[in-house]
Protein backbone atom coordinates (compact mmCIF):
# COMPACT_ATOMS: atom_id res chain seq x y z
CA UNK A 1 0.00 0.00 0.00
CA UNK A 2 1.37 3.46 -0.96
CA UNK A 3 1.75 6.10 1.72
CA UNK A 4 -0.84 8.28 -0.05
CA UNK A 5 -3.37 5.44 0.03
CA UNK A 6 -2.53 4.74 3.67
CA UNK A 7 -3.25 8.37 4.52
CA UNK A 8 -6.41 8.77 2.41
CA UNK A 9 -8.03 5.41 3.22
CA UNK A 10 -7.61 5.96 6.96
CA UNK A 11 -8.06 9.74 7.08
CA UNK A 12 -10.78 9.51 9.76
CA UNK A 13 -8.48 7.54 12.06
CA UNK A 14 -5.56 9.95 11.65
CA UNK A 15 -7.71 13.04 12.26
CA UNK A 16 -10.09 11.72 14.95
CA UNK A 17 -7.59 9.97 17.25
CA UNK A 18 -7.27 12.65 19.95
CA UNK A 19 -5.69 12.64 23.38
CA UNK A 20 -6.42 15.08 26.23
CA UNK A 21 -3.33 16.84 27.57
CA UNK A 22 -2.80 17.10 31.30
CA UNK A 23 -1.84 20.75 30.97
CA UNK A 24 -4.10 23.49 29.79
CA UNK A 25 -3.46 25.41 26.60
CA UNK A 26 -5.06 28.24 24.67
CA UNK A 27 -8.61 27.42 23.65
CA UNK A 28 -10.13 23.97 23.63
CA UNK A 29 -7.65 22.74 21.01
CA UNK A 30 -4.74 23.78 23.26
CA UNK A 31 -5.74 21.00 25.65
CA UNK A 32 -5.88 18.37 22.88
CA UNK A 33 -3.05 16.29 21.47
CA UNK A 34 -3.69 15.30 17.84
CA UNK A 35 -2.49 11.77 18.50
CA UNK A 36 -3.49 10.34 15.11
CA UNK A 37 -1.56 12.97 13.14
CA UNK A 38 1.38 12.58 15.51
CA UNK A 39 1.39 8.81 14.79
CA UNK A 40 1.11 9.52 11.06
CA UNK A 41 4.21 11.73 11.22
CA UNK A 42 6.08 8.99 13.11
CA UNK A 43 4.96 6.43 10.55
CA UNK A 44 6.16 8.53 7.60
CA UNK A 45 9.48 9.06 9.37
CA UNK A 46 9.95 5.37 10.13
CA UNK A 47 9.03 4.38 6.56
CA UNK A 48 11.59 6.91 5.30
CA UNK A 49 14.52 5.36 7.18
CA UNK A 50 13.43 1.79 6.34
CA UNK A 51 13.42 2.39 2.58
CA UNK A 52 9.63 2.17 2.27
CA UNK A 53 8.80 5.79 1.51
CA UNK A 54 10.05 6.02 -2.10
CA UNK A 55 10.79 3.23 -4.60
CA UNK A 56 14.38 2.08 -5.10
CA UNK A 57 16.08 2.80 -8.44
CA UNK A 58 18.50 0.05 -9.64
CA UNK A 59 20.45 2.76 -11.51
CA UNK A 60 21.41 4.50 -8.24
CA UNK A 61 25.00 4.12 -7.11
CA UNK A 62 24.75 1.66 -4.17
CA UNK A 63 25.41 2.89 -0.65
CA UNK A 64 28.47 0.63 -0.43
CA UNK A 65 30.20 2.82 -3.04
CA UNK A 66 29.13 5.97 -1.22
CA UNK A 67 30.64 4.62 2.01
CA UNK A 68 33.91 3.88 0.19
CA UNK A 69 34.11 7.50 -0.99
CA UNK A 70 33.42 8.74 2.54
CA UNK A 71 36.14 6.40 3.88
CA UNK A 72 38.59 7.82 1.32
CA UNK A 73 37.82 11.40 2.44
CA UNK A 74 38.19 10.31 6.06
CA UNK A 75 41.64 8.84 5.29
CA UNK A 76 42.65 12.12 3.63
CA UNK A 77 41.63 14.07 6.76
CA UNK A 78 43.79 11.73 8.86
CA UNK A 79 46.69 12.24 6.44
CA UNK A 80 46.31 16.04 6.75
CA UNK A 81 46.29 15.75 10.56
CA UNK A 82 42.79 17.21 10.83
CA UNK A 83 41.41 14.15 12.62
CA UNK A 84 42.99 11.27 14.53
CA UNK A 85 43.24 7.80 13.05
CA UNK A 86 40.66 5.47 14.56
CA UNK A 87 41.19 1.93 15.73
CA UNK A 88 39.65 -0.64 13.35
CA UNK A 89 35.89 -0.73 13.95
CA UNK A 90 34.09 -4.05 14.46
CA UNK A 91 31.59 -5.20 11.86
CA UNK A 92 27.91 -4.62 12.64
CA UNK A 93 26.53 -8.00 13.69
CA UNK A 94 23.22 -9.41 12.45
CA UNK A 95 21.83 -9.14 15.99
CA UNK A 96 22.48 -5.39 16.00
CA UNK A 97 20.49 -4.79 12.81
CA UNK A 98 16.91 -3.89 13.85
CA UNK A 99 15.30 -4.57 10.44
CA UNK A 100 16.04 -5.73 6.89
CA UNK A 101 17.30 -3.20 4.36
CA UNK A 102 16.30 -2.81 0.69
CA UNK A 103 18.79 -3.61 -2.08
CA UNK A 104 21.46 -0.96 -2.45
CA UNK A 105 21.34 0.10 1.21
CA UNK A 106 24.00 -0.55 3.86
CA UNK A 107 24.23 -0.47 7.63
CA UNK A 108 26.78 1.98 9.01
CA UNK A 109 27.44 3.88 12.23
CA UNK A 110 28.04 7.53 12.93
CA UNK A 111 31.63 6.95 14.03
CA UNK A 112 32.37 5.56 10.51
CA UNK A 113 31.09 8.66 8.73
CA UNK A 114 31.53 11.55 11.18
CA UNK A 115 33.76 13.01 13.87
CA UNK A 116 32.06 12.93 17.26
CA UNK A 117 32.05 15.98 19.56
CA UNK A 118 34.76 17.91 17.64
CA UNK A 119 36.61 20.80 19.28
CA UNK A 120 36.99 24.29 17.85
CA UNK A 121 39.84 26.70 18.45
CA UNK A 122 39.41 30.44 17.93
CA UNK A 123 42.47 32.67 18.23
CA UNK A 124 40.60 35.95 18.73
CA UNK A 125 38.88 36.11 22.14
CA UNK A 126 36.81 39.10 20.98
CA UNK A 127 35.34 37.23 18.00
CA UNK A 128 31.56 37.04 18.01
CA UNK A 129 30.03 33.59 17.70
CA UNK A 130 26.58 32.00 18.02
CA UNK A 131 25.42 30.77 21.42
CA UNK A 132 22.64 28.15 21.48
CA UNK A 133 21.07 27.05 24.79
CA UNK A 134 18.66 24.09 24.74
CA UNK A 135 15.43 26.16 24.46
CA UNK A 136 16.64 27.53 21.11
CA UNK A 137 16.89 24.04 19.58
CA UNK A 138 13.71 22.96 17.82
CA UNK A 139 11.91 19.62 17.87
CA UNK A 140 10.85 20.18 14.26
CA UNK A 141 11.90 17.89 11.45
CA UNK A 142 13.86 20.60 9.63
CA UNK A 143 16.61 20.77 12.27
CA UNK A 144 16.05 24.48 12.79
CA UNK A 145 17.47 26.50 15.66
CA UNK A 146 17.90 30.07 16.85
CA UNK A 147 20.92 31.63 18.51
CA UNK A 148 22.22 34.51 20.60
CA UNK A 149 25.44 36.42 19.89
CA UNK A 150 28.28 36.19 22.40
CA UNK A 151 32.03 36.77 22.43
CA UNK A 152 34.28 33.71 22.24
CA UNK A 153 36.10 34.59 25.48
CA UNK A 154 32.82 34.41 27.44
CA UNK A 155 31.80 30.92 26.31
CA UNK A 156 34.91 29.08 25.11
CA UNK A 157 35.07 26.98 28.29
CA UNK A 158 32.37 24.80 29.80
CA UNK A 159 30.22 24.51 26.68
CA UNK A 160 29.83 22.27 23.63
CA UNK A 161 31.48 23.47 20.40
CA UNK A 162 30.10 23.12 16.87
CA UNK A 163 30.26 24.69 13.42
CA UNK A 164 28.06 25.16 10.35
CA UNK A 165 27.10 21.76 8.94
CA UNK A 166 27.45 19.89 12.25
CA UNK A 167 24.49 17.82 13.47
CA UNK A 168 23.55 17.60 17.15
CA UNK A 169 21.04 15.75 19.29
CA UNK A 170 19.99 16.47 22.87
CA UNK A 171 21.29 13.72 25.14
CA UNK A 172 19.38 14.48 28.36
CA UNK A 173 15.82 13.45 29.23
CA UNK A 174 13.19 14.61 28.25
CA UNK A 175 14.84 16.65 25.46
CA UNK A 176 16.14 13.48 23.78
CA UNK A 177 12.73 11.76 23.82
CA UNK A 178 11.16 14.97 22.47
CA UNK A 179 13.64 14.72 19.56
CA UNK A 180 15.43 18.01 20.04
CA UNK A 181 18.05 17.94 17.28
CA UNK A 182 19.60 20.44 14.89
CA UNK A 183 21.64 20.89 11.75
CA UNK A 184 23.67 23.98 12.56
CA UNK A 185 23.60 26.69 9.90
CA UNK A 186 23.91 30.46 9.63
CA UNK A 187 26.16 30.60 12.69
CA UNK A 188 27.97 33.88 13.38
CA UNK A 189 31.42 33.49 11.78
CA UNK A 190 30.47 29.85 11.16
CA UNK A 191 31.02 28.90 14.80
CA UNK A 192 28.67 27.98 17.63
CA UNK A 193 28.79 27.14 21.32
CA UNK A 194 25.93 25.78 23.37
CA UNK A 195 24.52 23.57 26.06
CA UNK A 196 26.71 20.73 27.27
CA UNK A 197 23.67 18.42 26.93
CA UNK A 198 24.42 17.76 23.25
CA UNK A 199 26.11 15.05 21.24
CA UNK A 200 27.60 16.57 18.07
CA UNK A 201 28.60 14.88 14.80
CA UNK A 202 30.66 16.49 12.02
CA UNK A 203 30.36 14.42 8.81
CA UNK A 204 33.71 13.61 7.16
CA UNK A 205 32.36 14.51 3.73
CA UNK A 206 30.06 17.15 2.25
CA UNK A 207 28.44 14.46 0.11
CA UNK A 208 26.72 13.14 3.25
CA UNK A 209 23.11 14.34 3.35
CA UNK A 210 22.70 15.98 6.74
CA UNK A 211 18.91 16.06 6.48
CA UNK A 212 18.77 12.31 5.98
CA UNK A 213 20.93 11.75 9.07
CA UNK A 214 18.60 14.06 11.00
CA UNK A 215 15.62 11.88 10.02
CA UNK A 216 17.42 8.93 11.60
CA UNK A 217 17.95 10.84 14.84
CA UNK A 218 14.24 11.67 14.96
CA UNK A 219 12.91 8.26 13.94
CA UNK A 220 10.82 6.33 16.52
CA UNK A 221 13.19 3.34 16.38
CA UNK A 222 16.27 5.51 17.14
CA UNK A 223 14.50 7.33 20.00
CA UNK A 224 13.18 4.10 21.49
CA UNK A 225 16.63 2.46 21.32
CA UNK A 226 18.33 5.52 22.80
CA UNK A 227 15.85 5.73 25.66
CA UNK A 228 16.54 2.09 26.54
CA UNK A 229 20.30 2.83 26.71
CA UNK A 230 20.07 5.90 28.96
CA UNK A 231 22.13 6.01 32.14
CA UNK A 232 21.88 8.17 35.27
CA UNK A 233 19.28 8.98 37.90
CA UNK A 234 15.65 9.91 37.29
CA UNK A 235 15.31 13.36 35.73
CA UNK A 236 19.02 13.37 34.86
CA UNK A 237 19.19 10.39 32.50
CA UNK A 238 21.36 10.77 29.42
CA UNK A 239 22.02 8.91 26.18
CA UNK A 240 25.66 7.79 26.33
CA UNK A 241 28.16 8.74 23.64
CA UNK A 242 28.69 5.05 22.86
CA UNK A 243 25.08 4.74 21.68
CA UNK A 244 25.29 7.92 19.61
CA UNK A 245 28.38 6.86 17.71
CA UNK A 246 27.72 3.11 17.43
CA UNK A 247 23.97 2.72 16.93
CA UNK A 248 23.42 1.20 13.44
CA UNK A 249 22.20 3.67 10.79
CA UNK A 250 20.28 2.48 7.69
CA UNK A 251 22.18 4.16 4.85
CA UNK A 252 20.64 4.45 1.34
CA UNK A 253 22.21 5.49 -1.98
CA UNK A 254 22.83 9.24 -2.18
CA UNK A 255 20.20 9.78 -4.90
CA UNK A 256 17.60 7.93 -2.84
CA UNK A 257 18.47 10.01 0.23
CA UNK A 258 17.58 13.10 -1.80
CA UNK A 259 14.29 11.57 -3.03
CA UNK A 260 13.43 10.57 0.54
CA UNK A 261 13.96 14.12 1.81
CA UNK A 262 11.80 15.62 -0.96
CA UNK A 263 8.97 13.12 -0.36
CA UNK A 264 9.24 13.41 3.41
CA UNK A 265 9.01 17.22 3.23
CA UNK A 266 5.90 17.00 1.03
CA UNK A 267 4.19 14.58 3.41
CA UNK A 268 5.08 16.66 6.48
CA UNK A 269 3.48 19.64 4.74
CA UNK A 270 0.35 17.53 4.24
CA UNK A 271 0.40 16.62 7.95
CA UNK A 272 0.72 20.33 8.79
CA UNK A 273 -2.42 21.03 6.75
CA UNK A 274 -4.33 18.18 8.40
CA UNK A 275 -3.23 19.43 11.81
CA UNK A 276 -4.34 23.01 11.12
CA UNK A 277 -7.70 21.86 9.74
CA UNK A 278 -8.26 19.63 12.78
CA UNK A 279 -7.39 22.40 15.26
CA UNK A 280 -9.60 24.91 13.43
CA UNK A 281 -12.45 22.40 13.36
CA UNK A 282 -12.07 21.60 17.08
CA UNK A 283 -12.04 25.29 18.03
CA UNK A 284 -15.04 26.06 15.79
CA UNK A 285 -16.95 23.11 17.26
CA UNK A 286 -16.26 24.19 20.84
CA UNK A 287 -17.19 27.82 20.08
CA UNK A 288 -20.47 26.63 18.57
CA UNK A 289 -21.19 24.48 21.64
CA UNK A 290 -20.41 27.32 24.05
CA UNK A 291 -22.46 29.84 22.03
CA UNK A 292 -25.51 27.57 21.97
CA UNK A 293 -25.14 26.69 25.66
CA UNK A 294 -24.85 30.41 26.37
CA UNK A 295 -28.38 30.88 25.00
CA UNK A 296 -29.62 28.65 27.84
CA UNK A 297 -28.11 30.72 30.65
CA UNK A 298 -29.17 33.94 28.85
CA UNK A 299 -32.80 32.79 28.57
CA UNK A 300 -35.15 35.34 30.15
CA UNK A 301 -37.93 32.92 31.07
CA UNK A 302 -38.95 29.25 31.13
CA UNK A 303 -40.52 29.42 27.65
CA UNK A 304 -37.35 30.88 26.07
CA UNK A 305 -35.22 28.31 27.89
CA UNK A 306 -37.38 25.46 26.54
CA UNK A 307 -37.14 26.90 23.03
CA UNK A 308 -33.34 27.23 23.21
CA UNK A 309 -32.95 23.73 24.65
CA UNK A 310 -35.10 22.29 21.84
CA UNK A 311 -32.71 23.86 19.33
CA UNK A 312 -29.73 22.21 21.05
CA UNK A 313 -31.37 18.82 21.56
CA UNK A 314 -32.09 18.55 17.81
CA UNK A 315 -28.32 18.44 17.22
CA UNK A 316 -27.25 16.80 20.48
CA UNK A 317 -25.41 13.91 18.78
CA UNK A 318 -23.24 16.23 16.69
CA UNK A 319 -22.67 18.88 19.37
CA UNK A 320 -21.58 16.73 22.32
CA UNK A 321 -18.89 14.58 20.75
CA UNK A 322 -15.83 15.68 22.75
CA UNK A 323 -14.93 15.67 26.43
CA UNK A 324 -14.60 19.47 26.33
CA UNK A 325 -18.14 19.86 24.97
CA UNK A 326 -19.56 17.60 27.71
CA UNK A 327 -17.61 19.58 30.33
CA UNK A 328 -19.17 22.77 28.93
CA UNK A 329 -22.61 21.15 29.17
CA UNK A 330 -21.97 20.19 32.82
CA UNK A 331 -20.89 23.74 33.64
CA UNK A 332 -24.04 25.09 31.93
CA UNK A 333 -26.24 22.75 33.98
CA UNK A 334 -24.46 24.03 37.08
CA UNK A 335 -25.02 27.67 36.03
CA UNK A 336 -28.72 27.02 35.36
CA UNK A 337 -29.02 25.42 38.79
CA UNK A 338 -27.65 28.42 40.71
CA UNK A 339 -29.67 30.86 38.57
CA UNK A 340 -32.94 29.12 39.41
CA UNK A 341 -33.54 27.98 35.83
CA UNK A 342 -33.05 24.23 36.20
CA UNK A 343 -36.37 23.36 37.88
CA UNK A 344 -39.64 25.33 38.09
CA UNK A 345 -40.40 27.40 41.18
CA UNK A 346 -43.25 26.38 43.49
CA UNK A 347 -45.25 29.31 44.95
CA UNK A 348 -46.04 27.11 47.97
CA UNK A 349 -42.36 26.94 49.02
CA UNK A 350 -41.32 28.93 52.07
CA UNK A 351 -39.47 31.95 50.58
CA UNK A 352 -35.80 32.67 51.27
CA UNK A 353 -36.78 35.85 53.14
CA UNK A 354 -38.21 33.63 55.90
CA UNK A 355 -34.95 31.66 56.03
CA UNK A 356 -33.06 34.92 56.57
CA UNK A 357 -35.33 35.74 59.51
CA UNK A 358 -34.64 32.33 61.08
CA UNK A 359 -30.89 32.83 60.58
CA UNK A 360 -31.06 36.24 62.29
CA UNK A 361 -32.92 34.70 65.24
CA UNK A 362 -30.36 31.89 65.63
CA UNK A 363 -27.42 34.30 65.44
CA UNK A 364 -29.00 36.52 68.10
CA UNK A 365 -29.47 33.49 70.36
CA UNK A 366 -25.84 32.35 69.85
CA UNK A 367 -24.61 35.86 70.71
CA UNK A 368 -26.81 35.85 73.83
CA UNK A 369 -25.30 32.48 74.86
CA UNK A 370 -21.79 33.79 74.27
CA UNK A 371 -21.08 31.17 71.59
CA UNK A 372 -20.31 33.74 68.88
CA UNK A 373 -19.37 37.41 68.88
CA UNK A 374 -21.85 39.98 67.68
CA UNK A 375 -21.14 40.59 64.00
CA UNK A 376 -20.81 44.03 62.47
CA UNK A 377 -23.58 44.54 59.90
CA UNK A 378 -22.42 43.55 56.43
CA UNK A 379 -22.85 46.26 53.76
CA UNK A 380 -26.09 46.19 51.74
CA UNK A 381 -25.92 44.60 48.27
CA UNK A 382 -26.06 47.07 45.39
CA UNK A 383 -27.74 46.25 42.08
CA UNK A 384 -24.34 46.52 40.37
CA UNK A 385 -23.02 43.62 42.45
CA UNK A 386 -25.79 41.22 41.48
CA UNK A 387 -24.56 39.00 38.62
CA UNK A 388 -28.08 38.01 37.50
CA UNK A 389 -31.75 38.42 38.37
CA UNK A 390 -33.21 35.94 40.84
CA UNK A 391 -36.54 34.12 40.57
CA UNK A 392 -39.45 34.86 42.91
CA UNK A 393 -38.83 33.52 46.41
CA UNK A 394 -35.02 33.80 46.18
CA UNK A 395 -32.88 36.44 47.91
CA UNK A 396 -29.35 37.75 47.39
CA UNK A 397 -27.32 37.73 50.60
CA UNK A 398 -23.67 37.77 51.59
CA UNK A 399 -22.07 34.46 52.51
CA UNK A 400 -21.06 35.99 55.84
CA UNK A 401 -24.71 36.51 56.75
CA UNK A 402 -25.58 32.80 56.50
CA UNK A 403 -22.22 31.19 57.33
CA UNK A 404 -19.63 31.60 60.03
CA UNK A 405 -16.08 30.98 58.75
CA UNK A 406 -13.41 29.40 60.90
CA UNK A 407 -9.82 29.74 59.68
CA UNK A 408 -7.39 26.94 60.54
CA UNK A 409 -4.78 27.20 63.27
CA UNK A 410 -1.09 27.91 62.54
CA UNK A 411 0.28 24.69 64.03
CA UNK A 412 4.06 24.88 64.45
CA UNK A 413 6.11 22.58 62.25
CA UNK A 414 8.19 21.44 65.25
CA UNK A 415 5.02 19.86 66.64
CA UNK A 416 4.62 17.65 63.57
CA UNK A 417 4.97 13.89 64.07
CA UNK A 418 4.79 10.85 61.81
CA UNK A 419 1.73 9.50 63.65
CA UNK A 420 -1.09 11.02 65.70
CA UNK A 421 -3.86 13.46 64.77
CA UNK A 422 -3.99 14.36 61.09
CA UNK A 423 -3.90 18.03 60.11
CA UNK A 424 -6.01 19.07 57.12
CA UNK A 425 -3.81 21.28 54.92
CA UNK A 426 -4.22 22.79 51.44
CA UNK A 427 -2.33 19.80 50.08
CA UNK A 428 -5.09 17.54 51.41
CA UNK A 429 -7.92 19.29 49.54
CA UNK A 430 -8.70 18.45 45.93
CA UNK A 431 -11.74 19.46 43.85
CA UNK A 432 -14.62 18.17 45.95
CA UNK A 433 -12.69 15.52 47.89
CA UNK A 434 -9.87 15.11 50.38
CA UNK A 435 -6.48 13.69 49.43
CA UNK A 436 -4.33 12.22 52.21
CA UNK A 437 -1.28 11.20 50.16
CA UNK A 438 0.91 13.75 51.92
CA UNK A 439 0.04 13.84 55.63
CA UNK A 440 1.34 15.62 58.73
CA UNK A 441 0.26 14.87 62.31
CA UNK A 442 0.48 16.29 65.81
CA UNK A 443 0.50 14.17 69.01
CA UNK A 444 -2.91 12.80 70.07
CA UNK A 445 -2.65 14.36 73.53
CA UNK A 446 -2.74 17.88 72.02
CA UNK A 447 -6.38 17.55 70.90
CA UNK A 448 -7.78 19.14 74.08
CA UNK A 449 -5.83 22.34 73.34
CA UNK A 450 -7.43 22.75 69.91
CA UNK A 451 -11.04 21.61 70.29
CA UNK A 452 -12.32 24.54 68.20
CA UNK A 453 -10.37 23.20 65.21
CA UNK A 454 -11.71 19.63 65.34
CA UNK A 455 -13.53 18.81 62.11
CA UNK A 456 -16.77 16.84 61.97
CA UNK A 457 -18.49 14.71 59.36
CA UNK A 458 -20.18 16.80 56.60
CA UNK A 459 -18.15 19.93 57.39
CA UNK A 460 -17.30 21.86 54.23
CA UNK A 461 -13.74 23.15 53.98
CA UNK A 462 -12.21 25.45 51.39
CA UNK A 463 -8.61 26.20 50.40
CA UNK A 464 -7.64 29.82 50.86
CA UNK A 465 -4.54 29.50 48.68
CA UNK A 466 -4.19 30.93 45.20
CA UNK A 467 -4.00 30.31 42.35
CA UNK A 468 -7.56 29.23 41.74
CA UNK A 469 -7.14 27.28 38.53
CA UNK A 470 -9.66 26.91 35.70
CA UNK A 471 -10.87 23.56 36.99
CA UNK A 472 -12.38 25.33 39.99
CA UNK A 473 -11.93 26.10 43.64
CA UNK A 474 -10.43 23.51 45.97
CA UNK A 475 -13.03 22.43 48.50
CA UNK A 476 -14.09 19.20 50.20
CA UNK A 477 -16.90 17.72 52.28
CA UNK A 478 -15.44 15.94 55.30
CA UNK A 479 -16.42 12.27 55.50
CA UNK A 480 -16.23 9.78 58.36
CA UNK A 481 -13.04 8.27 56.88
CA UNK A 482 -11.30 11.68 57.16
CA UNK A 483 -11.74 11.81 60.93
CA UNK A 484 -10.26 12.58 63.33
CA UNK A 485 -8.48 15.61 61.90
CA UNK A 486 -7.81 19.25 62.76
CA UNK A 487 -8.00 22.38 60.63
CA UNK A 488 -4.64 23.92 59.63
CA UNK A 489 -4.13 27.56 58.61
CA UNK A 490 -5.10 28.71 55.09
CA UNK A 491 -8.01 26.28 55.11
CA UNK A 492 -11.43 27.59 56.21
CA UNK A 493 -14.53 25.78 57.45
CA UNK A 494 -18.10 26.81 56.61
CA UNK A 495 -20.52 26.73 59.56
CA UNK A 496 -24.15 27.07 58.43
CA UNK A 497 -26.62 29.01 60.59
CA UNK A 498 -30.03 27.32 61.10
CA UNK A 499 -29.15 24.62 58.54
CA UNK A 500 -30.71 26.78 55.85
CA UNK A 501 -28.48 25.68 52.95
CA UNK A 502 -27.73 22.08 52.05
CA UNK A 503 -24.08 21.15 51.59
CA UNK A 504 -24.87 19.88 48.11
CA UNK A 505 -26.28 23.22 46.95
CA UNK A 506 -23.39 25.14 48.53
CA UNK A 507 -20.86 23.00 46.62
CA UNK A 508 -22.79 23.67 43.40
CA UNK A 509 -22.36 27.40 44.07
CA UNK A 510 -18.67 27.01 44.91
CA UNK A 511 -18.09 25.39 41.50
CA UNK A 512 -19.93 28.10 39.55
CA UNK A 513 -18.20 30.73 37.46
CA UNK A 514 -20.16 33.37 39.38
CA UNK A 515 -18.51 32.46 42.67
CA UNK A 516 -15.03 31.86 41.19
CA UNK A 517 -15.15 35.22 39.40
CA UNK A 518 -16.28 37.02 42.55
CA UNK A 519 -13.51 35.56 44.72
CA UNK A 520 -10.77 35.69 42.05
CA UNK A 521 -11.84 37.92 39.13
CA UNK A 522 -8.39 38.19 37.52
CA UNK A 523 -7.75 34.42 37.87
CA UNK A 524 -5.15 34.97 40.57
CA UNK A 525 -3.57 38.33 41.22
CA UNK A 526 -0.39 38.91 43.19
CA UNK A 527 -2.05 38.19 46.56
CA UNK A 528 -1.11 34.62 47.55
CA UNK A 529 -4.18 33.91 49.72
CA UNK A 530 -7.91 34.51 49.90
CA UNK A 531 -9.11 35.92 53.23
CA UNK A 532 -12.19 34.80 55.15
CA UNK A 533 -13.27 38.48 54.95
CA UNK A 534 -13.43 38.10 51.17
CA UNK A 535 -15.50 34.96 51.56
CA UNK A 536 -17.91 36.76 53.91
CA UNK A 537 -18.40 39.56 51.36
CA UNK A 538 -19.15 37.31 48.37
CA UNK A 539 -22.76 36.94 47.27
CA UNK A 540 -24.96 33.88 47.55
CA UNK A 541 -28.37 33.23 45.95
CA UNK A 542 -30.43 32.00 48.91
CA UNK A 543 -33.42 29.91 47.82
CA UNK A 544 -36.25 27.94 49.41
CA UNK A 545 -35.11 24.69 51.01
CA UNK A 546 -37.64 22.61 49.07
CA UNK A 547 -36.29 24.01 45.80
CA UNK A 548 -32.75 23.20 46.89
CA UNK A 549 -33.80 19.55 47.18
CA UNK A 550 -35.45 19.58 43.73
CA UNK A 551 -32.38 21.19 42.13
CA UNK A 552 -29.99 18.68 43.72
CA UNK A 553 -32.14 15.76 42.55
CA UNK A 554 -32.24 17.14 38.99
CA UNK A 555 -28.52 17.94 39.05
CA UNK A 556 -27.65 14.40 40.11
CA UNK A 557 -29.74 13.00 37.25
CA UNK A 558 -28.25 15.31 34.59
CA UNK A 559 -24.63 15.05 35.76
CA UNK A 560 -24.94 11.26 35.80
CA UNK A 561 -26.10 11.43 32.16
CA UNK A 562 -23.14 13.69 31.31
CA UNK A 563 -20.71 11.29 33.00
CA UNK A 564 -22.12 8.35 31.02
CA UNK A 565 -21.78 10.35 27.80
CA UNK A 566 -18.21 11.30 28.68
CA UNK A 567 -17.38 7.65 29.36
CA UNK A 568 -18.73 6.66 25.93
CA UNK A 569 -16.64 9.40 24.28
CA UNK A 570 -13.53 8.34 26.23
CA UNK A 571 -14.04 4.70 25.26
CA UNK A 572 -14.49 5.60 21.59
CA UNK A 573 -11.41 7.84 21.75
CA UNK A 574 -9.37 5.02 23.26
CA UNK A 575 -10.45 2.77 20.39
CA UNK A 576 -9.28 5.42 17.89
CA UNK A 577 -5.89 5.61 19.65
CA UNK A 578 -5.49 1.83 19.49
CA UNK A 579 -6.50 1.89 15.83
CA UNK A 580 -3.88 4.56 15.03
CA UNK A 581 -1.23 2.45 16.82
CA UNK A 582 -2.31 -0.70 14.99
CA UNK A 583 -2.26 1.03 11.59
CA UNK A 584 1.24 2.37 12.28
CA UNK A 585 2.59 -1.01 13.38
CA UNK A 586 0.99 -2.81 10.43
CA UNK A 587 2.40 -0.34 7.91
CA UNK A 588 5.94 -0.61 9.33
CA UNK A 589 5.98 -4.38 9.73
Swiss-Prot record:
User: Which controlled-vocabulary keywords does the entry list?
Assistant: DNA-binding, Restriction system
Q: Which InterPro entries match?
A: Restrct_endonuc_typeI_TRD, Restrct_endonuc_typeI_TRD_sf, Type-I_RE_S_subunit
GO BP annotation list:
DNA restriction-modification system
Q: Name one GO molecular function term.
A: DNA binding
Which CDD domains does UniProt cross-reference here? RMtype1_S_EcoEI-TRD1-CR1_like, RMtype1_S_StySKI-TRD2-CR2_like
Q: Which Pfam families match?
A: Methylase_S
Q: Does the keyword Hydrolase apply?
A: no
Q: Tell me its family.
A: Belongs to the type-I restriction system S methylase family.
What else is on record for this protein?
Type I restriction and modification enzymes are complex, multifunctional systems which require ATP, S-adenosyl methionine and Mg(2+) as cofactors and, in addition to their endonucleolytic and methylase activities, are potent DNA-dependent ATPases.
- Its biological purpose: The specificity (S) subunit of a type I restriction enzyme; this subunit dictates DNA sequence specificity. In the presence of the R subunit the complex can also act as an endonuclease, binding to the same target sequence but cutting the DNA some distance from this site. Whether the DNA is cut or modified depends on the methylation state of the target sequence. When the target site is unmodified, the DNA is cut.
How it assembles, according to the record, is: The type I restriction/modification system is composed of three polypeptides R, M and S. The restriction enzyme has stoichiometry R(2)M(2)S(1) while the methyltransferase is M(2)S(1).
Free-text domain note: Contains two DNA recognition domains, each specifying recognition of one of the two defined components of the target sequence.
What is the name of the protein in this document?
Answer: Type I restriction enzyme EcoAI specificity subunit
